[in-house]
Design a protein with these regions (language model features):
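Catalytic center-proximal scaffold of phosphoryl-transfer enzymes
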Residues: 1-28, 66-414
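Short metal-coordination and nucleic-acid-contact micro-motifs, chiefly zinc-binding Cys/His arrays
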Residues: 30-36, 42, 51, 64-67
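Short Cys/His-rich metal-coordination motifs, predominantly Zn2+-binding knuckles/fingers
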Residues: 38-43, 58-60, 73-76
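Short Cys/His-rich "knuckle" micro-motifs
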Residues: 46-51, 82-83
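Short cysteine/histidine-rich metal-coordination sites, predominantly Zn2+-binding motifs
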Residues: 52-61, 87-95
Length: 414
């Protein structure tokens, strides 16, 4: 081994052992000073006794002697030290170690990789241990009451941006464990994860190279098969936490899915709504392909000036030209005519959501790229190669991913 690396590891081990001993001494002193009283009634515990407690911490294993006693009011045995430190019965990991391991679990591609990474920074744990703690905490996360941060005394004016999107998660199907004799087994089931990104427009900056960057953003993601009304409630609740009621303007950007626009009318009716430009572009290209054939120079020549008009504040003209396609007599196959009518109707329904030049002048986004980026980040953890989730396993880990992204994770150990 490299001499410098070996020396550094040795010194780190010495410092780690010093930290472990210091932590052990302070914890033992705290435990000794705690009164052996019932946490509910305040009465002395009955039949008290001393027991060993081994606690795994970031610094290593600390070994303590702690009191136990019976609390008649609770009808159970109580350890005052565990109560004071927020440890559940039989919990072996300290809150700080559990928080670090859980964060690692949400960031890397699997529980096995998380275990290997934890071992590299000196806190070895099995992938089964990480899985058990993630599932327990993910279940607890569903019961959290997330507080609304207090606004600063002199808060400057701001606008809020909300982007809605979704992506597909791979779960175990009804025939996941079926034997080889099962005909046409449905081993995999795909379900949508509805997600959203919320940020203040003033937090949108650019790097020196011109790349967009969000200084601060917040995420919403709900488990598979969450009803749109419940997803809308979750988005509205998070938006309120982030200043929805105080925002000067609320920008809402999303694709053309009907359920998204129904949700917007229900929960965010006063928001300035925009159809994601890239989806509008794709539908305009679909019209060009219907008229001139896919991949032809004529299709490109037809669509380019209309895209320029769409971005240049002439969206009403674009919609009118599309409507004229249906007014002019033309001989088309019935299937092509039906498809063309569907695409034109798409733009008619969104004629008030195509003001891209206005959005650009306000510095607001024209597309929902941040929401798509969130989906890709979550997929890196939740849709890796070979991953097929049970519903509880996916739901609990998804909740933890969102908590850590929003920096609400300390509430799990509060």
């Amino acid at each position: 081994m490299n001499a410098l690396r070996a020396l550094e590891q040795a010194v780190l081990a010495e410092g780690r052992e010093w930290t472990r001993r210091r932590l052990e001494a302070q914890l033992q002193a705290q435990s000794d000073a705690l009164p052996a009283h019932c946490p509910q009634s305040g009465l002395p515990l009955q039949d008290t006794r001393w027991r060993d407690l081994q606690l795994h911490t970031v610094a290593g294993v600390v070994r303590l002697r702690v009191r136990h006693g019976y609390a008649p009011a609770l009808e159970r045995w109580v350890c005052p030290a565990r109560e004071a430190w927020g440890l559940e019965a039989y919990q072996r990991l300290s809150p700080e170690l559990e928080a670090r391991l859980t964060y690692t679990t949400t960031e890397v591609g699997s529980y096995e990789r998380a275990a290997r990474m934890a071992a590299t920074w000196g806190s070895p744990a099995s992938d089964g241990c990480l899985h058990a703690h993630a599932q327990r905490l993910g279940k607890a996360a569903a019961q959290l009451l997330l507080p609304t941060p207090a606004p600063p005394p002199r808060e400057p004016e701001f606008s809020l941006v909300i982007m809605l999107d979704g992506w597909m998660a791979r779960e175990r199907g009804p025939d996941w464990g079926a034997g080889p004799r099962k005909k046409n087994p449905q081993r995999i089931a795909w379900h949508a994860i509805k997600s959203a990104v919320i940020y203040r427009l003033e937090q949108r900056v650019e790097t020196r190279g011109g790349r967009g960057l969000l200084v601060e953003k917040f995420a919403v993601a709900t488990p598979p098969e969450t009803a749109p009304v419940d997803f809308g409630a979750a988005v509205q609740a998070e938006a309120r936490r982030r200043g929805l009621g105080r925002a000067q303007v609320v920008y809402l950007v999303m694709d053309g899915a009907v359920w998204l626009w129904d949700l917007a009318d229900d929960r965010l009716a006063s928001a300035l709504k925009t159809l994601d430009f890239h989806h509008a572009r794709d539908h305009l290209w679909a019209v060009a392909h219907l008229l001139h054939g896919e991949g032809t120079p004529e299709a490109r020549a037809w669509v380019q000036p209309r895209l320029k008009s769409l971005r240049g504040g002439r969206e009403a003209r674009v919609v009118r030209r599309l409507e004229q396609l249906l007014e002019a007599p033309a001989v088309r196959p019935p299937a092509q005519q039906i498809e063309l009518e569907r695409e034109v109707r798409y733009f008619q329904n969104h004629r008030d959501h195509l003001h891209y030049q206005t959005m650009e002048e306000a510095g607001a986004p024209r597309g929902s790229g941040a929401a798509e980026s969130l989906g890709k980040q979550l997929q890196q953890r939740l849709r890796g190669c070979g991953q097929a989730w049970s519903r509880p396993g996916l739901t609990h880990l998804l909740r933890l991913c969102v908590l850590f992204k929003n920096r609400d994770d300390p509430l799990l150990w509060n």
